UniProtKB/Swiss-Prot annotation:
Pfam families: tRNA_m1G_MT
Recorded catalytic activity of this chain's protein: guanosine(37) in tRNA + S-adenosyl-L-methionine = N(1)-methylguanosine(37) in tRNA + S-adenosyl-L-homocysteine + H(+)
Lineage, uppermost ranks: Bacteria, Pseudomonadati, Pseudomonadota, Gammaproteobacteria, Alteromonadales
Disulfide pattern: none
Gene Ontology CC: one annotated term: cytosol
Localisation per UniProt entry: Cytoplasm
Protein's name according to its UniProt entry: tRNA (guanine-N(1)-)-methyltransferase
Gene that produces this protein: trmD
Keywords, comma-separated and alphabetical: Cytoplasm, Methyltransferase, S-adenosyl-L-methionine, Transferase, tRNA processing
Gene source species: Shewanella denitrificans (strain OS217 / ATCC BAA-1090 / DSM 15013)
Length: 248
């Protein structure tokens, strides 16, 4: 997957290219990331990238010309078909369904805003989609862009090594993940659930599925609004609720 990022702070993206899952993906040629800094497209000796908003008010906006030229440079490098995304609190909220959609793209260009944002006409003429990572305010679009990159990269074939790792992540099937355990078998008087030590793969599968459904029911019940549970899942949920009521 090819990724282009428009940012005033390209150094921040070393967190993507040099470390962890995404760093290995870059090293193995599964992920290609390039950055464009609007400061490199300025024409004054101060490399000015902000400007006052019409109508007054606090704060500044990103200057149109350097930002637009940076986007055009990224588009030229990406070739035809690259989708331009602006990270914005006004955008569609990113969830696993959206991540799956974005992962189908061969190339993405991510525009990271700063200050009070960007000129609306840039959004209208240069941006294909706006995405948000949540209903809160950040200092810029870099952290949301890195969040999007990390979540999308996990779905690129070969990045995780085992596709099952991605399939078992929270939200991959619209549900929260089940609990996980490693050694030692006993920790401060708490034992690993016996079923996980049984070696019975079907029982383990059912336990994990039930725990996933049950955890979603307890912690994020609103997620069920967009789910169509199978007969098996419905039965497991009923058993989980019954067991929970008995232990309460």
């Amino acid at each position: 997957m090819w990724l282009g990022v428009i940012t005033l702070f390209p150094e921040m993206f070393r967190a993507v290219t040099d470390f962890g899952v995404t760093g290995r993906a870059v090293k193995n040629g599964l992920l290609e990331l390039h950055t464009w800094n609007p400061r490199d497209f300025t024409h004054d000796r101060h490399s000015t990238v902000d400007d006052r908003p019409y109508g007054g008010g606090p704060g500044m906006l990103m200057m149109v010309q350097p930002l637009r030229d940076a986007i055009h440079a990224a588009k030229a490098a990406a070739g035809d078909g690259a989708k331009v995304i602006y990270l914005s609190p006004q955008g569609r909220k990113l969830d696993q369904h959206g991540v799956t959609e974005l992962a189908k793209s061969d190339s993405l260009i991510l525009v990271c805003g700063r200050y009070e944002g960007v000129d609306e006409r840039i959004i209208q003429t240069e941006v294909d989609e706006e995405w948000s990572i949540g209903d809160y305010v950040l200092s810029g679009g870099e952290l949301p862009a890195m969040t999007l990159i990390d979540s999308v990269a996990r779905l690129v074939p070969g990045v995780l090594g085992k596709q099952a790792s991605a399939e078992q992540d929270s939200f991959s099937e619209g549900l929260l993940d089940c609990p996980h355990y490693t050694r030692p078998e006993q920790l401060d008087g708490m034992d690993v659930p016996a079923v996980l030590l049984s070696g019975d793969h079907e029982k383990i599968r059912l336990w994990r599925l039930q725990q996933s459904i049950g955890r979603t029911f307890l912690r994020r019940p609103e997620l069920f609004e967009n789910l169509a549970l199978t007969d098996e899942q419905t039965t497991l949920l009923a058993q989980f609720v019954n067991d929970t009521d008995k232990s309460a």
